[in-house]
């Protein structure tokens, strides 16, 4: 952990290694660290000695650990007459009801293809089940989406019609991926709303020839009128959304009746949302950091006055800046015996980049040489699927034009934030389904895009920050697969981007950048 990360100096951090990852985890001295070795162990049990608990069986070492569930975890379901029950009456009923849902969640997890928990899932799921506030930094492509969905939604009650969970992320495409995974995991009766911005279509006409009001969100992948959209949001048990759109429906439109019974607010790509260096498009639009602060404030103001729980705060990101750590600390709930200390995981500062990804660079003297080299690389590399990253929309468009003019035989599309939402959605869908093999993209796809077929990432332009580089590179080599990144480095009298190569190498003990070899036949 570096000196900047240590600005949370009130916590005790312990250095641990889980799998191939070295992490710094805050622990109270003497407190147990529970690791989920099998998803079946998330099924709750009850006995007089341990109360409601999870039993973790570590077959490899022939040991087991019992994690007693706290009051926050055991208050996540509606049970008729619960107020008049004592603990011996309530807990067996809780376990009976929660066990049924947990079995469903576990069964769907196996059906999704997860045979055993990944490192991040093993580390984080037990703490999320205990409803701990969390700040989790872990590398891309390690299963973090399933970690926060499984851990948070363990507390979901299908019979409770109130808004229980909010999942926020930074882009339409990532929100859609989270939504689709949540729909797969949960019972069909669960009311889940996908709430993302969508430009109005100029060709939407009713039978009379006049334009029909269309909601600016896409709920359940179907166009909705504003009235239909508002009603679905009001009835939702779970909302999965982009930051700006959620702020609009909560703070501006007031479509969410109450957050009083909210169990958790989970923010993916937290660092990007609260510490983004992206300039605002308009001075009249709040940045996402200010929107996040107002959302947290509103949730706190609506929480029951006599409640020690409140909404759990869950923050995930592949990179975490010192400023994001400071903001997360200010959002965490105040300590109480029920809530406990927040659970914070920070990667070792000297090993941020993904293992399994071979990183190469090619020196270029100017923009025109870059264009020649990218054409050569596309002809020589055996590409399953790939992304070419550019820093500007204009550059992305020029690359696409170049590929079309040169008739490069790889299906491709340009992808950036100025495209209409429907166009972005269709391109994203075609890329996921491998109908498009190559995206020429701005940093819109650098975070959270989960396409397992990507085996190479090209940096046509080097990004401005190390964090963005890490996110870009993380699009390949997903879930332990092998991947390659190739960066075009400008070296001339005016600019020497080899300094960025040195910075990348300084932040990774095991994975270094090297000059691209002449023979690319064995590269992929």
Swiss-Prot record:
Protein name: Putative ATP-dependent RNA helicase R458
Positions contributing to ATP binding: 138-145
Swiss-Prot/TrEMBL catalytic activity: ATP + H2O = ADP + phosphate + H(+)
PROSITE patterns: HELICASE_ATP_BIND_1, HELICASE_CTER
Pfam families referenced in this protein's UniProt entry, alphabetically: DEAD, Helicase_C
Enzyme class: hydrolase
Sequence motif DEFD box, location on chain: 268-271
Signal peptide: none
Keyword terms: ATP-binding, Helicase, Hydrolase, Nucleotide-binding
Top-level taxon of the source organism: Viruses
Gene3D superfamilies in the record: P-loop containing nucleotide triphosphate hydrolases
Residues annotated as domain Helicase ATP-binding: 125-338
TM annotation in the entry: none
GO molecular function: ATP binding; ATP hydrolysis activity; nucleic acid binding; RNA helicase activity
Function, as annotated: Putative ATP-dependent RNA helicase.
């Amino acid at each position: 952990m570096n000196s900047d990360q240590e600005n949370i100096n009130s916590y005790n951090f312990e250095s641990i290694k889980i799998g191939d990852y070295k992490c710094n985890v805050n622990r109270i001295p003497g407190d147990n660290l529970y690791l989920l070795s099998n998803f079946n162990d998330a099924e709750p049990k009850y006995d007089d000695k341990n109360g409601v608990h999870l039993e973790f069986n570590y077959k490899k070492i022939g040991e087991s650990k019992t994690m007693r569930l706290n009051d926050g975890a055991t208050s996540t379901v509606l049970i008729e007459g619960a107020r008049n029950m004592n603990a011996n009456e309530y807990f067996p009923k809780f376990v009976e009801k929660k066990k049924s849902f947990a079995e469903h969640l576990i069964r769907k997890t196996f059906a999704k293809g997860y045979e055993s928990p990944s490192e991040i899932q093993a580390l984080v799921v037990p703490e999320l089940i205990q409803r701990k506030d969390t700040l989790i930094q872990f590398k891309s492509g390690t299963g973090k989406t399933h970690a926060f969905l499984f851990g948070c939604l363990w507390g979901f009650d299908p019979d409770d019609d109130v808004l229980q969970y909010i999942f926020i992320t930074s882009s339409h495409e990532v929100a859609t991926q989270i939504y689709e995974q949540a729909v797969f995991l949960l019972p069909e009766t669960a009311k889940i709303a996908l709430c993302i911005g969508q430009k109005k279509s100029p060709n939407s006409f009713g039978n009379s020839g006049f334009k029909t009001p269309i909601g600016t969100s896409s709920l359940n992948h179907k166009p909705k009128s504003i009235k239909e959209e508002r009603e679905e949001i009001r009835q939702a048990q779970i909302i999965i959304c982009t930051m700006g759109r959620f702020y609009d429906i909560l703070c501006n439109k007031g479509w969410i009746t109450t957050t009083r019974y909210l169990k958790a607010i989970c923010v993916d790509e937290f660092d990007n949302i609260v510490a983004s260096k992206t300039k605002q498009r308009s001075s009249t639009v709040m940045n996402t950091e200010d929107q996040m602060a107002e959302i947290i404030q509103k949730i706190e103001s609506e929480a029951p006055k006599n409640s020690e729980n409140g909404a759990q705060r869950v923050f995930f990101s592949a990179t975490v800046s010192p400023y994001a750590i400071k903001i997360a600390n200010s959002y965490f709930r105040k300590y109480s015996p029920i809530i406990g200390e927040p659970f914070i995981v920070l990667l070792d500062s000297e090993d941020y980049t993904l293992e399994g990804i071979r990183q190469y660079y090619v020196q270029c003297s100017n923009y025109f040489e870059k264009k020649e080299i990218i054409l050569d690389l596309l002809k020589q590399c055996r590409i399953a699927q790939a992304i070419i990253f550019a820093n500007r929309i204009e550059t992305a468009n020029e690359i696409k034009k170049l590929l079309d003019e040169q008739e490069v035989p790889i299906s491709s599309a340009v992808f950036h934030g100025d495209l209409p939402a429907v166009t972005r959605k269709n391109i994203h869908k075609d890329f996921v389904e491998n109908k498009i093999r190559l995206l020429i993209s701005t940093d819109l796809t650098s975070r959270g895009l989960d396409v397992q077929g990507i085996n190479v990432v090209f940096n046509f332009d080097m990004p401005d920050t190390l964090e963005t580089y890490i996110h870009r590179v993380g699009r390949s080599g997903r879930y332990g697969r092998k991947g390659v990144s190739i960066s075009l480095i400008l070296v001339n009298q005016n600019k020497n981007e080899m300094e960025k190569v040195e910075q990348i190498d300084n932040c990774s003990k095991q994975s270094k950048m090297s000059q691209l070899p002449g023979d690319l036949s064995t590269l992929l």
